[in-house]
Curated annotation (Swiss-Prot):
Gene: ANGPTL5
Signal peptide: 1-25
Cellular component annotations (GO), alphabetically ordered: collagen-containing extracellular matrix; extracellular space
Native organism: Homo sapiens
UniProt cross-references to PANTHER family, sorted A to Z: ANGIOPOIETIN-RELATED PROTEIN 5, FIBRINOGEN/TENASCIN/ANGIOPOEITIN
Location of this chain's protein in the cell: Secreted
Protein name: Angiopoietin-related protein 5
Disulphide bonds in the chain: 310-314, 324-338
Length: 388
């Protein structure tokens, strides 16, 4: 059996022979010997030429393969770089998108959580109110014992038996009619007539002059007794009254402010308030820290009856204010260029403290106003021969 190289050589010789025959046919003037010699020489040359061509082809192939390999390698590197950049860019955009989605979801959850908490607080307050109204314990029943005020009732009935706190009917001097009041008969000897109380925010204190004049709310819960009724109580003859402001913070801290010689001028003077000496641990917010804060000797103001001293406007925390009542969400108070006190402000829940909230600006903690949860204003008779 022939080897591949031998077969190739035989095939090459056959080709050379055929070519030689063709040349011999065209060139008849050459001799046979010359033809044979030429054929042999041509065969030898063809063989050398074939080898040379094979070498050149091999070199061209190797060079082409190297170029192709180099191009393929560069293309792979280029594609890898592009793919890597695309993955990094996609990862970053995906992270940013997910972060934004998570922030939006968290904000929505926080909002819904606050809404649920506020609704739960409202439901709890309403449930408590309904339950309280269903109960009718003896101390809350009006006692048909007409006295001038709660101090008078305490001094009269208390000499015979223990006087419970609750609803009583009083008929102060100067009043043409009797009316019902809540009497605190327990705190520091009792005999205190409650003229205002804030505990849960159920009663709306955003009222006009007529409501603050006659009073509103529930004497067993939140209420404002009324300017006319307060006037009749504190302007009786030969006596004076002490005003006691009881404050409770959201963390259940208690504080108070007390003023002797508390009285009001009549309706023609818009129930201008007068205060005596201060004592307590909550600070004197009625008089404030500056002259323009002083609410003593100021008339009462509401959103429709403006007596707050802002003529035509006053500056409050850098803000131009034309009406303190409007600034405080249309609540009524003895404003003086607004001032530091407003116990009739809007009752806020869950730690909120706004400019319209219940305010006693001199009661502070860590140099910040204390957030007030509940407050009551009580008056007690003081016998004072110098009172006019």
């Amino acid at each position: 059996m022939m080897s591949p190289s031998q077969a190739s050589l035989l095939f090459l010789n056959v080709c050379i022979f055929i070519c030689g025959e063709a040349v011999q046919g065209n060139c008849v003037h050459h001799s046979t010997d010359s033809s044979v010699v030429n054929i042999v020489e041509d065969g030898s040359n063809a063989k050398d030429e074939s080898k040379s061509n094979d070498t050149v082809c091999k070199e061209d192939c190797e060079e082409s393969c190297d170029v192709k390999t180099k191009i393929t390698r560069e293309e792979k590197h280029f594609m890898c770089r592009n793919l890597q950049n695309s993955i990094v860019s996609y990862t970053r955009s995906t992270k940013k998108l997910l972060r934004n989605m998570m922030d939006e979801q968290q904000a929505s959850l926080d909002y819904l959580s606050n809404q649920v908490n506020e609704l739960m607080n409202r439901v709890l307050l309403l449930t408590t109110e309904v339950f309280r109204k269903q109960l009718d314990p003896f101390p809350h029943r009006p006692v048909q014992s007409h006295g001038l005020d709660c101090t008078d009732i305490k001094d009269t009935i208390g000499s015979v038996t223990k006087t419970p706190s609750g609803l009583y009917i009083i008929h102060p001097e100067g009043s043409s009619y009797p009316f019902e009041v809540m009497c605190d008969m327990d705190y520091r000897g009792g005999g205190r007539t409650v003229i205002q109380k804030r505990i849960d925010g159920i009663i709306d204190f955003q009222r006009l002059w007529c409501d603050y004049l006659d009073g509103f709310g529930d004497l067993l819960g939140e209420f404002w007794l009324g300017l006319k009724k307060i006037f009749y109580i504190v302007n009786q003859k030969n006596t004076s009254f002490m005003l006691y402001v009881a404050l409770e913070s959201e963390d259940d801290t208690l504080a108070y402010a007390s003023y002797d010689n508390f009285w009001l001028e009549d309706e023609t003077r818009f129930f201008k308030m007068h205060l005596g000496r201060y004592s307590g641990n909550a600070g004197d917010a009625f008089r404030g820290l500056k002259k323009e804060d002083n609410q003593n000797a100021m008339p009462f103001s509401t959103s429709d009856v403006d007596n707050d001293g802002c003529r035509p406007a006053c500056l409050v925390n850098g803000q131009s204010v034309k009406s303190c009542s409007h600034l405080h969400n249309k609540t009524g108070w003895w404003f003086n260029e607004c001032g530091l006190a407003n116990l009739n402000g809007i009752h806020h829940f869950s730690g909120k403290l706004l400019a319209t909230g219940i305010q006693w600006g001199t009661w502070t903690k860590n140099n910040s106003p204390v957030k007030i949860k509940s407050v009551s204003m009580k008056i007690r008779r003081m016998y004072n021969p110098y009172f006019k």
